[in-house]
Structure formats: C-alpha cells, structure tokens
Amino acid sequence: MPPDKFEFWIDLNLPPKMAEWLIENFSVVAKSFKELHFEITPDTEIYKIAAKHSNIIVITTKDVDFKNLQSAIGSPPKILYLNTGNITNENLKKLILTKFGEVLELFSDPENNFIEISQS
C-alpha cells in the first residue's frame, strides 16, 4: 500500500509539529489529535473512530493505552508505538528517519497492525 493510503494520527503526547514534519519528510497524510479536535476525547473513543476507517488509520503514539486497546479490542486501526521514554524532539526525528521506510513497508501488509519503535 503506498504511503498516501495511510493516514497517521499523531497523539497529543508527541510534538505538536510531528504531523507537519511527517508530511514534509515522507509525503504521507498526517494529522495531529489537536487538528482532529481530540484534545479531550478519551482514548477508547479515538480508537473506535479510527477503527471505522478500516486499515487506513495509523495511531502514532507513546501511550501504552492504545497498545492495550488493540490487544483487548483488536484491529483496525494500526498502531505505531514509539517506545522511546524521554527523548528530545531532535532525537525522535532522527529515530523516525531511520525507521519510517520500514514502517511503511511493514504496514503495507494488512496483517501487520502493530509496530513498535524503540531506542537502541
């Protein structure tokens, strides 16, 4: 599936400009939770909304709650879990730059619904 077939939803726990940065660097569709007006929406509701979009939505988060929701409820949506702990925005971008091509390739397989990126 080409990168423009996915829509990356960027959780509030990530830098506010992450969606814009992903668009500029990878030509993907990306929207922040703020842009989607999810500032006070519970994670369970966000998950249900994303699930209605089939396998297109990729919730990008550092929040283990979405990982747990996927374990409990199933997929869709897809989850890109950034298990990085405390990390500077610059180092987070560097990490994503090295892994994002592989992320897109793995998510192209409909069976891959969860990818975790960790610091080495």
What residue ranges belong to the model's regions?
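Conserved strand-to-helix beginnings and helix N-cap segments that scaffold or border functional pockets
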Residues: D43-T44, K93
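Acidic, PIN/NYN-like endoribonuclease modules and their adjacent C-terminal/linker elements
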Residues: M1-L12, P16, E20-S27, F38, ...
